[in-house]
Regions:
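Single conserved hydrophobic/aromatic residue that forms the stacking wall/gate
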Residues: 1-11
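FAD-dependent oxidoreductase catalytic-site/capping-region signature
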Residues: 68-72, 85-280, 288-300
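Glycine-rich beta-alpha-beta "Rossmann" dinucleotide-binding loop(s) and their flanking helix/strand
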Residues: 26-47
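Rossmann-like dinucleotide-binding core of oxidoreductases
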Residues: 40, 46, 55-86, 91, ...
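Short hydrophobic core segments
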Residues: 12-29
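Acidic glycine-/aspartate-rich tracts in secreted/extracellular proteins
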Residues: 20-22, 32-34, 197-201
Length: 300
């Protein structure tokens, strides 16, 4: 991090590319950010910029699971002889379950007819998990449909919680704080329920597991979403581009008020893209490279 004795390096040409979590952390440790936060941890204010670490956005997802009647899921494919067969298949053909991504199927829906584009994405897998974090499968064949709100309105923050660069920053997601986010996710969960109960799936779906069939009201679904939901790990926005008081970089990705320092990563996105953030971040990097080259030419 650019802090203490290295603070003077800020005034040279620098490009910060630490991501939406660590870019604001490094800036704050370097004395660039909200003076109130910096002084709280004894950090000298080099440059006042209240927007650093604000405007945090991420996709929020809820896993809904069903038990499947037929033995056609990932559970059966990763046991005994089937697992040996799949391992050999991958070794010789580079195909099969060992090539599967986290979600093998996706779908996009509009939760309200008046909106022009989808506002929910489904991540679908032919498996359900007893413990998602440890990747332990359920004891029965299962299916997971995970609605994810694409354009959340809720905003959180990422800030340092000490002057020690080894300490992780405080991440406040503030998910589902806005009513539109709550309504959208609830509707997304209801649509997932309707998909799983469609006539075309009656020979496959045995029963609803989580949330179970007794959880039907909006309040119950929201409680389930709050308890079981999690991030999709698409953090953006904490050093946002713009011209308002909370903007951190200008339209050439330079720290506002510091012409020699740029931020080039997903943190500069003013709003979250309605999909994965990898490709947009590559675009940001390529655009920034062109800007840097243009600036070098103009300085010669």
């Amino acid at each position: 991090p650019i802090h203490s004795s290295a603070a003077s390096d800020v005034y040279k040409r620098q490009v910060l590319c630490a991501g939406a979590v660590q870019s604001p952390q490094i800036l704050e440790l370097s004395g660039i950010g909200n003076p109130n936060i910096l002084r709280q941890y004894g950090i000298e204010v080099v440059h006042s910029l209240p927007g650093v670490g604000e405007n945090y956005q991420d996709h929020y997802m809820v896993r809904q699971t069903w038990e499947i009647k037929k033995k056609i899921t990932l559970k059966e494919q990763t046991r005994g002889v089937s697992l040996i067969r799949e391992a050999l298949r991958y070794a010789f053909t580079r195909r099969g379950i060992m090539t599967y991504p986290a979600g093998i199927l996706a779908g996009f829906v509009r939760t309200r007819p008046e909106i022009a584009t989808p506002d929910v994405q489904y991540h679908i897998a032919h498996a359900s998990f007893l413990d998602v974090k440890k990747r332990i499968l359920d004891k029965h064949p299962g299916m997971t449909i995970s609605p994810c709100q694409l354009r959340p309105e809720s905003r959180g923050s990422i800030h340092i919680k000490s002057s020690n660069p080894e300490d992780q920053p405080a991440i406040k997601g503030n998910f589902l704080a806005e009513e539109i986010d709550r309504r959208t996710l609830i509707e997304g969960m209801k649509i997932a329920k309707r998909i799983a109960s469609a006539p075309a799936l009656k020979d496959f779906v045995a029963k609803e597991l989580n949330p179970n069939e007794e959880i039907q009201s909006d309040d119950e679904l929201l409680d389930f979403a709050r308890e079981r939901g999690n991030t999709v790990y698409h953090p953006v926005g904490t050093c946002k581009m713009g011209s308002d008081p909370k903007a951190v970089v200008d339209d050439r990705l330079r720290i506002i008020g510091m012409q020699s320092l740029r931020v080039v990563d997903a943190s500069i996105m003013p709003t979250l893209t309605s999909g994965n953030t990898n490709a947009p971040t590559i675009m940001i990097a390529e655009k920034a490279a062109d800007m840097i080259k243009e600036d070098e030419v103009s300085l010669r």
